[in-house]
């Protein structure tokens, strides 16, 4: 690779690398896939027939399983996807057959401030444009499946308003569901960040006209927070997916009984939208390593994991399979540990905690970096004091990973502005708490820059481990929420709103709660529920304002703080810098 990320943008590096891509069939052959197990999407992307592969390799042993997580990030992100790809490249340089699993990027962040989550520099996945803009259509399928349930609901409400019970039955053998228009937890979804759609009124002419819908309050969430996406991430196979889809609660009737997609007779059609999407996607790093891309839930407002199916494939096909959890240990790794591994039955061999000097300085008192603006001078000048104070956040996360019984490996994702003294301080503090540390320069040098990290991960995978969940699922839901708050976030207490307590008690009484997971919704920018609180906040309480219930996924979803399921678009979004070269048809400006 001749282009240096010091001199060229990510999209320029990607376009240069794409001239030498392996075809998806050659990529699959290197991975051990049969020709017929790949469904091509063009020459360089494809889907993998997971059912055929897992059946063929049923008796094969699994490879080593590594999760990549991070400290509490800045709004800029600390390079987890870049590190995931760089680690796979480094492992390949060490002669290990390796693969990665990452999430499909959402159009919201891609067109917003965070970018496409394709990695960066010399550790990114290609083809970049296709990966970043729609890919193989999985998120579109999720949107269609989800929104179809809302079409079924709103049209049913209109017909029940317009017709008597006898007429409903005569027209289509339809029984009245008696839907309560004030108790509809589900909304619509789209794959962009749009604060104007958080609260809307639909069916405005439905009051006076019988054919214009049903007038009521509604809302949009971002598509990756959809329960359909959550089910895609945790389903073992299509049968499991189909069963879960039928249990999604769309609304409640006027007696408070749940109305599901099965009640609306839309669950089969929703599944039909997803029959291709359930097969994981396969692309490559710029050095030719296989990258599975499947599912795309955020970690702050959803489960934050790539799919169980993709990980099962990677473990059967690779000696080392690296998966990624969204945001920090408190958000993404906690859900990997206590939800994804519970559903999959898989246990990790190591956890990589990505940190940067930049993030440690932000936790140590430096001004918070703002996307789209120049970094304050505190981030480009040496300041070991900021690094040392901010390392409390890193150490907190190291100790959390240790509670899971998995050996942590701290990856210092090196920036060109880091100084030897700052790096030495991080290494010293990590070694004092018994964590392996590796400095990695994969962004600048690709796999060659990740050899120290690869060696540390190989070493950690050979260490004895005793993987244990944080809590017993037989505990009451409230106690499990409190345990996450105390043990993972460091809260002194949990305050539940009256509405949250009411919903928790009802869920506890109406369901076998030992079958339900706890999927927290909380800001990713702090250990607390206040994004302004950096480092390791003390003397604080977690504020649970509401509870959602994902009946199909089997999640109780506590919502803490002021976070919303529909992010907004800021004042300097990246779409302002994305364009097309009309002579070549190439997209430029994606990062």
Curated annotation (Swiss-Prot):
It is an enzyme of class 6 (ligase). Keywords: ATP-binding, Ligase, Nucleotide-binding, One-carbon metabolism. GO terms for molecular function: ATP binding; formate-tetrahydrofolate ligase activity. Its EC number is 6.3.4.3. PROSITE patterns: FTHFS_1 (PS00721). It catalyses: (6S)-5,6,7,8-tetrahydrofolate + formate + ATP = (6R)-10-formyltetrahydrofolate + ADP + phosphate. Signal peptide: none annotated. One of its GO terms (biological process) is tetrahydrofolate interconversion. ATP binds at residues 74-81. Pfam families: FTHFS. Pathway: One-carbon metabolism; tetrahydrofolate interconversion. Belongs to the formate--tetrahydrofolate ligase family. This is Formate--tetrahydrofolate ligase. It comes from Lawsonia intracellularis (strain PHE/MN1-00). The gene is fhs.
């Amino acid at each position: 690779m001749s282009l240096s990320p010091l001199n060229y943008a990510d999209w320029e590096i990607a376009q240069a690398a794409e001239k030498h891509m392996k075809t998806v069939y050659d990529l699959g052959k290197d991975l051990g896939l049969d020709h017929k197990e790949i469904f091509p999407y063009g020459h360089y992307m494809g889907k993998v027939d997971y059912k055929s592969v897992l059946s063929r390799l049923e008796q094969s042993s699994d490879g080593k399983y590594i999760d990549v997580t991070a400290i509490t990030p800045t709004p800029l992100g600390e390079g987890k996807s870049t590190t995931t790809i760089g680690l796979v490249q480094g492992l390949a340089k060490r002669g290990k057959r390796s693969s990665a699993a990452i999430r499909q990027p959402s159009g919201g962040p891609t067109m917003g401030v965070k970018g496409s989550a394709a990695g960066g520099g010399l550790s990114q996945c290609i083809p970049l444009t296709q990966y970043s803009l729609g890919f193989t259509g999985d998120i579109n399928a999720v949107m269609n499946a989800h929104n179809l349930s809302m079409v079924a609901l709103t049209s049913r409400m209109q017909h029940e308003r317009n017709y008597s019970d006898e007429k409903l039955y005569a027209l289509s053998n339809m029984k009245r569901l008696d839907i309560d228009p004030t108790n509809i937890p589900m909304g619509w979804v789209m794959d962009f960040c749009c604060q104007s759609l958080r609260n809307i009124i639909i069916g405005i002419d439905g009051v006076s006209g019988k054919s214009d819908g049903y007038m009521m309050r509604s809302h949009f969430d971002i598509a990756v927070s959809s329960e359909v996406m959550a089910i895609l991430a945790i389903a073992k196979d299509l049968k499991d997916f189909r069963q879960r889809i039928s249990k999604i609660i769309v609304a409640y009737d006027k007696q408070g009984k749940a109305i599901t997609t099965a009640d609306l007779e839309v669950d089969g059609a929703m599944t039909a939208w997803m029959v291709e999407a359930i097969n994981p996607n396969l692309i490559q790093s710029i050095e030719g390593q296989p990258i599975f891309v499947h599912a795309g839930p955020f970690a702050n407002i959803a489960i934050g994991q790539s799919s169980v199916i993709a990980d099962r494939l990677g473990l059967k096909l690779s000696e080392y399979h690296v998966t990624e959890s969204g945001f920090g240990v408190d958000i993404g790794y906690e859900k990997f540990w206590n939800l994804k591994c519970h559903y999959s039955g898989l246990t990790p061999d190591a956890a990589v905690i990505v940190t940067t000097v930049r993030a440690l300085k932000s936790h140590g008192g430096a001004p918070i970096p703002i996307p789209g603006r120049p970094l304050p001078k505190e981030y480009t000048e040496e300041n070991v004091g900021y690094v040392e104070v901010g390392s409390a956040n890193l150490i907190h996360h190291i100790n959390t990973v240790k509670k899971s019984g998995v050996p942590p490996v701290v990856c210092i994702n090196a920036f060109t502005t880091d100084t030897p003294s700052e790096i030495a301080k991080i290494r010293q503090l990590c070694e004092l708490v018994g964590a392996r540390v590796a400095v990695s320069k994969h962004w600048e040098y690709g796999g060659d820059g990740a050899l120290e990290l690869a060696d540390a991960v190989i070493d950690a995978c050979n260490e004895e481990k005793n993987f244990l969940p944080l809590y017993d699922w037989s505990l009451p839901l409230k106690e499990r929420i409190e345990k996450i708050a105390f043990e993972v976030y460091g809260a002194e207490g949990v305050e539940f709103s009256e509405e949250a307590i009411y919903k928790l008690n009802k869920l506890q009484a109406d369901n076998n709660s030992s079958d339900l997971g706890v999927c927290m919704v909380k800001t990713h920018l702090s250990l607390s529920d206040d994004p302004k609180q950096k480092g390791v906040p003390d003397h604080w309480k977690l504020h649970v304002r509401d509870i959602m219930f994902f009946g199909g996924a089997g999640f109780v979803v506590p919502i803490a703080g002021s976070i919303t399921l529909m992010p907004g678009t800021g004042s300097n979004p990246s779409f302002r810098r994305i364009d097309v070269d009309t002579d070549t048809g190439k997209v430029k400006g994606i990062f």
